[in-house]
A protein has these predicted regions:
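Walker A/P-loop
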Residues: 1-13, 43-82, 97-99, 127-132
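Dynamic helix-loop-helix/coil hinge segments at AAA+ ATPase domain boundaries and subdomain interfaces
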Residues: 12-36, 80
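Short glycine-rich substrate-engagement loop in P-loop NTPases that contacts/grips substrate
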Residues: 34-39, 76-109, 120
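Conserved catalytic/switch belt of AAA+ P-loop NTPases
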Residues: 42-46, 112, 116-155
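A short hydrophobic beta-strand->loop->alpha-helix junction that borders the nucleotide-binding pocket
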Residues: 57, 79-87, 141-142, 162
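Conserved AAA+ ATPase "SRH/arginine-finger" region at the nucleotide-binding site
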Residues: 82-84, 158-171
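Conserved AAA+ ATPase "sensor/coupling" helix adjacent to the nucleotide-binding pocket
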Residues: 156, 169-185
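C-terminal helical "lid" of AAA+/P-loop NTPase domains
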Residues: 197-202, 208-220
Length: 220
């Protein structure tokens, strides 16, 4: 059943934050120091010269979204692991798939969310595949990678620092959700200026918190 079939029943829809996830750099709001034209990520994607990176920034700033956009723009196989629930076995399984892909001439991206939660042995398991180009690693972390990622792995990655969303970016994200989401756009939802400002200020630059709060407030 499609989103269009489910639009009248929000309980059957994916979470709003997932529905509103952009899939191109052009649609991505914020982090213009990385994604604007002629900036590092935009230039790397345009040149199809992908490199391993650590995305370091606060919650809800777009780390996972950027990783997925990068993978789609360069036409690579995308494997996603959470360091909270994955171990060395999962890493090796992903690398085995990436090695098979490479033999077919297809690149692979391994995205590891909360990479700072991997211990030394788990991070060590990534080294050879990163060094040999079997995988392009994208790690996401809220913690300073200089302290949480082992030096040999860190030296093979470019650290990209992301920032919390500005109030202006959050306002754009809010308006986009209200006007473009298949469900919310049918509800004629309006905010008083004071209520809108309170909502934007309450989420501390976190777009995910904003969309979650919007979803909750419009469902009760």
């Amino acid at each position: 059943m499609s989103l269009f079939n489910n639009a009248e029943n929000p309980r059957t829809l994916p979470p709003l934050a997932e529905r509103m996830r952009p899939n191109t750099l052009a649609a991505f709001l914020g982090q213009q120091h990385l994604v604007a034209e002629n900036r590092l990520l935009a230039k790397a994607i345009k040149a199809d010269r992908l490199f391993s990176i650590i995305l370091w920034g606060p919650p809800g700033c777009g780390k996972t979204t950027l990783a997925k956009i990068i993978a789609s723009q360069v036409d690579a196989h995308f494997y996603e692991l959470s360091a909270v629930s994955s171990g060395v076995k999962d890493v090796r399984a992903a690398m085995a798939k990436a090695k098979a892909n490479r033999e077919l001439g297809k690149p692979s991206i391994l995205f590891i969310d909360e990479i700072h939660r991997f211990n030394k042995a788990q991070q060590d398991a990534l080294l050879q595949a990163v060094e040999n180009g079997i995988i392009t690693l994208i790690g996401a972390t809220t913690e300073n990678p200089s302290f949480e990622v082992i030096s040999p792995l860190l030296s093979r990655c470019q650290v990209l620092k992301l920032t919390s969303h500005s109030k202006e970016d959050l306002a754009s994200i809010l308006e986009h959700a209200l006007s473009e989401d298949l469900f919310l756009s049918t509800q004629n939802i309006q905010f008083e200026d004071k209520g809108r400002d309170l909502l934007l200020e309450s989420v501390s630059g976190d777009a995910r918190r904003l969309l979650n709060a919007l979803e909750i407030s419009t469902s009760i």
